[in-house]
Amino acid sequence: PAGQEKRYAAEVEVLSARSRAVVREPVETLLVGSSIFRLWSSAATDLRDADLVNHGFGGSRTWELVEYVEELVVDFSPEVVVCYCGSNDVNAGASAAAIARRVEIFMKTVEDALPGVGIVYVAINRAPQKRDRWAIVDEANQRIEKACRKGPNRVFVDVNEGLFDARDSPRTELYLEDGLHFRPAAYREVFGPAVRNAIERVRASSRG
């Protein structure tokens, strides 16, 4: 949006340069998004992909995902892009419609630049810290899931089922004290299996 400060230019430059120095081509799977992915230090293990590229950055919002799509995604020509972003938009007061619109712009930009690419979007998590804004989270996820149905190589994965218990309460043991970010068990038990399955599905659809 107009007037937004570009907070992460330096971090993005360092991240992309570091990856260019070490990645093997072609890149099969690339993660991009906010701190939920940035803090997923065990992603390569949990997703069983030793060559995984993780470009989670800062406390990024969806407009920043669009802003840096070339440097963080397109320049690496991945086969599958896994995205998590939107949590910080909710905290900043963005509407569900605005969040979903920017996610769709991101997906379309990636698809236009990389024909045949697979995209996995991981649902915004219904964190305890956002309890009073779960309605916005739910609406944003519904809109993004609908957007994912528009593309043959897009998969929406809802991790929230695994983050809630049988009483429909958040599994607080999976969260850090801030009620927003995750402990390693959440990535190992919830994100890993769900995202692996989604990657397999999108690869199958990409192969036709």
Please identify what each model-predicted range represents.
Residues R126-G208:
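Catalytic His-Asp segment of secreted/periplasmic serine-dependent ester chemistry enzymes
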Residues L114-G118:
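A short helix->loop->beta-strand "cap" motif at the edges of active sites that frequently abuts
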Residues L31, L52-N54, F156:
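Conserved beta-strand scaffold positions in the cores of enzyme catalytic domains, especially
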Residues H55-G58, V80-A94, E104, K108-E111, ...:
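Cell-envelope and extracellular/periplasmic
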Residues L31, C83, V120-V122:
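Structural beta-sheet core signal
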Residues F37-V53, T62-A100, I124-P128:
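Oxyanion-hole/transition-state-stabilizing segment in secreted/luminal serine hydrolases
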Residues A96-F106, W134-N141:
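Charged helix-capping and loop-helix junction motifs
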